[in-house]
């Protein structure tokens, strides 16, 4: 795939919004320190120089990856991107209930994959990885917000409120019109108003 021709941050960098625009990222570069840490065999497929065997995927490798993420986020925030990261914390029991509902509700069957059960067996390993991610990558310029997510409505409210609170820290302005256009606003308005 094209992604494997680049470093692990490339696909996220090219997906960043233009200045003045918003984007929501689901399944971000944190997959590269989550899924690949739970399944380090996936790292071999990334064709990283010096990483040829599972023994090459060391603690130093993960430290470097966290540092790359922190440097990436520092770079983009320095250049005007506002980064707000949410970890939707779901209990194991709530995850079980949601998976059961997917199986019991025909219109939601499509959301289920047998792989969900295999990954669920690795719950504790995922929790350890989440803890590492939160501890090693929550920075003042790119903080993590841990959201209790067993109740969807509550989680959505907290996320929306957090986004609003974070954006209210900034003073945003609409783009300015060129003087030539601004000086002729009344003329443009009159022209449109007089159309029949």
Show the residue positions of the predicted features.
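Conserved nucleotide-binding/hydrolysis micro-motifs of P-loop NTPases
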Residues: 1-3, 28-32, 40, 89-96, ...
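NTP-dependent small-molecule kinase module
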Residues: 105-108, 122, 126-196
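Structural signal for well-ordered, non-membrane alpha-helices
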Residues: 70-73, 77, 131-134
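A Trp-anchored, charged/polar loop motif used as the substrate-binding/catalytic surface
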Residues: 6-9, 63-74
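Conserved catalytic network of the ASCE P-loop NTPase/AAA+ motor domain
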Residues: 14-18, 75-81, 137-139
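Conserved nucleotide-sensing/catalytic segment adjacent to the nucleotide-binding pocket
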Residues: 1-61
């Amino acid at each position: 795939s094209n992604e494997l021709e680049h470093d692990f941050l490339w696909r996220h960098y090219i997906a960043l919004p233009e200045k003045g625009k918003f984007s929501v990222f689901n399944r971000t570069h944190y997959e590269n320190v989550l899924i690949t840490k739970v399944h380090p065999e996936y790292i071999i497929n990334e064709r990283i120089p010096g990483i040829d065997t599972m023994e090459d995927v060391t603690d130093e490798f993960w430290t470097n990856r966290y540092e790359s993420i922190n440097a990436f986020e520092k770079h983009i925030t320095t250049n005007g991107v506002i980064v707000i990261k949410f970890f939707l914390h779901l209990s194991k029991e709530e995850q079980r209930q949601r998976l059961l509902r997917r199986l019991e509700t025909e219109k939601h069957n499509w959301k289920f994959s047998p792989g969900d059960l295999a990954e669920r067996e690795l719950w504790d390993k995922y929790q350890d990885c989440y803890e590492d991610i939160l501890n090693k990558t929550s920075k003042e310029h790119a903080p993590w917000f841990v959201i209790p997510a067993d109740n969807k409505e509550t989680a959505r409210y907290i996320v929306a409120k957090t986004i609003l609170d974070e954006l209210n820290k900034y003073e945003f302005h609409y783009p300015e019109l060129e003087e030539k256009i601004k000086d002729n606003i009344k003329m443009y308005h009159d022209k449109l108003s007089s159309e029949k």
